[in-house]
Curated annotation (Swiss-Prot):
Catalyzes the oxidation of 3-carboxy-2-hydroxy-4-methylpentanoate (3-isopropylmalate) to 3-carboxy-4-methyl-2-oxopentanoate. The product decarboxylates to 4-methyl-2 oxopentanoate. It comes from Buchnera aphidicola subsp. Uroleucon sonchi. It holds the Pfam family Iso_dh. The lineage of its organism: Bacteria, Pseudomonadati, Pseudomonadota, Gammaproteobacteria, Enterobacterales. Its cofactor is Mg(2+); Mn(2+). This is 3-isopropylmalate dehydrogenase. One of its GO terms (biological process) is L-leucine biosynthetic process. Substrate binds at residues 99, 109, 139, 228. Homodimer. The record marks 146, 196 as: Important for catalysis. NAD(+) binds at residues 78-91, 286-298. Belongs to the isocitrate and isopropylmalate dehydrogenases family. LeuB type 1 subfamily.
């Protein structure tokens, strides 16, 4: 174990600070109950940073992240800053620069439907009745059509047109594929690679390299699906999937599809990693300004983001499992926040944080 783990905490805007307060309860238990050598420092980001310092990602915040072993991120954005130029708004001017600065090429989005919450899924009950489902979307985050050049708009002969370019280098596909197979070895040993190799040259290269990488992992079963078929198969039977390996564009689409069939995005964490396993960990949802300050936001995604941080950047699987089990145990006992309750009997944000913290300490 390292002598010290430095965590940069960036609560951000909207419900970010509210759910981060509950994550602090878990961090403090890790530090004082489990004796993990954590050093935690908080920094401004997003709209709150714009209000205080004029920019969404202040130099002090970036330096604090550089000196950390991982970033625990809340959420950014809100109507207050929508009048700013697009490249100065909280989302575009903070989260994207952090991803680029730290070369966070891999986005991990778990989508799990807990058996206690099957009624939340929009899918037919018979589809999810087995054991819920547990899918991990592994999305390449720094290449592909979102970053390819040329990209733009133009006019010719009285016609206006727009264009984007899908570019993937072999090393980009290679590293995300290796990560997907390595993660599958910690789960159910299945990788399904998503592409459109019947049409796109970039997908042809994608499939070729994924096949080559798979030879290094003979105990992992590899399958391939075109993106259109994959979106249908997830609805038809999500239980058939374990790890989904996706390009930037396809991963953007399919990870959101996986999220919505769980019934509540407030349950879902995410991680963005670089090759050294430095990571930015955040809830999959947004800043939800409509419920800001009402103490009804679901803190589970933020708490599970702590679990992912402990699992991937600190490599402490046993501690991460304890956090995950604490969440499962309180769900089994019937504790719910407003977004996952089917009646008015639900816990406030701080109350949910308390019961999860108590479960983590007691191990029950």
């Amino acid at each position: 174990m390292k002598k010290k783990y430095r965590i940069a905490v960036l609560p951000g805007d909207g419900i970010g600070p509210e759910v981060m307060r509950e994550a602090y309860k878990i961090l403090n238990i890790l530090k004082y109950h489990f004796s993990l050598p954590l050093e935690i420092e908080e920094f401004d980001v997003g709209g709150s940073a714009i209000d205080k310092e004029g920019v969404a990602l202040p130099k002090k915040t970036l330096l604090g992240c550089e000196n950390a072993d991982a970033i625990l991120f809340g959420s950014v954005g809100g109507r207050k800053w929508d009048s700013l130029p697009i490249d100065q708004r909280p989302e575009r001017a903070s989260l994207l620069p952090l991803r680029k600065h730290f070369n966070l090429f891999a986005n991990l989005r778990p989508a799990q439907l807990y058996s206690e919450l099957k009624y939340l899924s929009p899918l037919a009950f018979l589809i999810v009745i087995k054991n819920g489902f547990n899918i991990l979307c592994v999305r390449e985050l720094t290449g592909g059509i979102y970053f390819g050049q040329p990209s733009g708009r133009s006019k010719t002969n009285n016609f206006e047109y727009a264009f984007d370019t899908e570019v993937y280098y072999d090393y980009e596909i290679n590293r995300i594929a290796h990560l997907a197979f390595q993660l599958a070895q910690t789960r159910n040993y299945k990788v399904c690679s998503i592409d459109k190799s019947n049409v796109l040259n970039s997908s042809i290269l994608w499939r070729e390299i994924v096949k080559k990488v798979s030879l290094s992992y003979p105990n992992v079963h590899l399958s391939h699906l075109y993106i259109d078929n994959a979106t249908m198969q997830i609805i038809k039977d999500p239980n058939q999937f374990d790890v989904l390996l996706c390009s930037n564009l396809f991963g953007d689409i399919i990870s959101d599809e996986c999220a919505i069939i769980t019934g509540s995005i407030g349950m879902l964490p995410s991680a963005s990693l670089n090759e050294k396993k430095f990571g930015l960990y955040e809830p999959a949802g947004g800043s939800a300004p409509d419920i800001e300050g009402k103490n009804i936001a679901n803190p589970i995604a933020q708490i599970l983001s702590v679990s992912m941080l402990v699992r991937y950047s600190m490599n402490l699987k046993n501690i991460a499992d304890k956090i995950d089990y604490s969440v499962i145990s309180i769900l089994k006992k019937g504790y719910k926040t407003a977004d996952i309750a089917h009646d008015n009997n639900y816990l406030k944000t701080n109350e949910m944080g308390d019961v999860i913290a108590d479960a983590l300490i007691s191990g029950e």
